[in-house]
Amino acid sequence: MSDSLSSLPVSDGGQFPSIGLGTWKIPDDVLPTLIPEAVSLGYRHFDCACDYGNEPAVGKGIANALEAGTVSREDLWITSKLWNTYHHPDHVRAACERSLQDLGLDELDLYLIHFPVTLAYVPFEERYPPGWFFDPEAENPSMKHVDVPYADTWGAMEELVDGGLVKRIGVCNLGTAMLRDLKSYARIQPSVLQVEMHPYLTQQNLLRFCQEQDIAVTAFSPFGASSYVPLSMADANESLFDDADIQSIAAKYGKTVGQIALRWAVQRGTVAIPKTQTVSHLQENIEIYDFGLSEEDMLTIDQMNRDRRFNDPAEFGEAAFNTFYPIFD
C-alpha cells in the first residue's frame, strides 16, 4: 500500500489506516481466522463494539495475528464503542474495561460513544451485551430512555484517556450542532466522528465541517444498503452495486463497484470500514491504492446523493424495538 491515502492523520499526529475491517455481524467462528488473514493482506485497522457481541472472538483473532508475528500491537488500530446503557459516568470505565478484557488488550487506539442515545443501565451479570431492550422478556418490550447529559458521558470518556485505557476518544452519529456543543466544553477534543456515509448519503456539509475542525471522519456502511437489506432496513432495489452510474465508472477503471465506492470514500478524506466474511472480498476491498478517480468521476459520485440514511433509530427503533427515538431531526 504505497498510496499516500493508505492512512489519514488524526489531530494528535497519529495515522489512521484509511481502510479497516468492520466487525458488525461477523460470526464468532469466523473472526479468529479472518482477522489474521486480514492482517496478512495489509489490514491494520479493526472496528469493534460492545453491541456487536463478538469482541471475545475479535480478541482471539487479534491474538492469533500477533502470535503469527506478522505485526506487533503497535502496528494495529483497534476501535471499540461505549454502548447506550453505559452513558452514566459511573459505568463508562467499567464498560471500557469489559471491552478491553474481551479484546485481550491493555489499551484501545480509539473509543467512541456509539449513539447519542441514553438507555437505562443493565448490569453485566444480567445481560451482556445488553442490546436495545430494557427487558426483552416483558409483554411489550421496549427501549427505556434515561436522562444523562452528553457532557457527563464525555467527561468520563476523558478520564479514560487520563487513565491510559484509550489513546483517543470520539463520537458516532452526531451532526454539526451536537459537535459544536461538544467542542465548546470538551477538555479533550473529539478525534473522530463515525457516521453512515456512502454515495447515497454523502453528508458533504458534515464532512467539510469536520475537516475544518480537525475531526477525522470514519464512514460506516460505505456500500450503503448491502448490510441492511437482510434486516429489512433497506430495499433490494436500493443497492449501490446495481447503480448504472457507478457501474460505468467501475468499468472505466477496470475495478469493481465496491472498489470505486471505497476509493471515493478515501479520496474525499474519510476512513472506510467495509464488512466482509470472505478472504476474496478482504483482498478486493484493500486493493484501492493503485488508482485514483478523476475530479469528474468524484463529482459524479458526489451527485448520486439521495440523503438516504439506512441506520436511523427513528425508524429501526420503532420497527424493531417498539420505541420512537429520533436523533437526526
What are these regions (language model features)?
Residues 77-90, 112-118:
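Structural motif corresponding to the early beta-alpha repeats
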Residues 84, 118-329:
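Beta/alpha (TIM)-barrel catalytic core signal, keyed to glycine-rich beta->alpha loops juxtaposed to Asp/Glu
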Residues 31, 92, 96, 150-153, ...:
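Aromatic/hydrophobic pocket-lining residues that form the small-molecule binding cavity
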Residues 25, 52, 82-86, 196-199:
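Short histidine/acidic/glycine/proline-rich micro-motifs that form metal-
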Residues 92-113, 160-163:
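CE4/NodB-like, metal-dependent polysaccharide N-deacetylase domain
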Residues 1-76, 89-94, 159, 222-226, ...:
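N-terminal binding-site loop/beta-alpha segment at the start of enzyme catalytic domains
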Residues 17-22, 46, 76-80, 108-113, ...:
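Hydrophobic faces of well-ordered beta-strands that scaffold small-molecule active sites
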Residues 10-11, 59-73, 100-104, 183-186, ...:
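Acidic (Asp/Glu)-rich catalytic clusters
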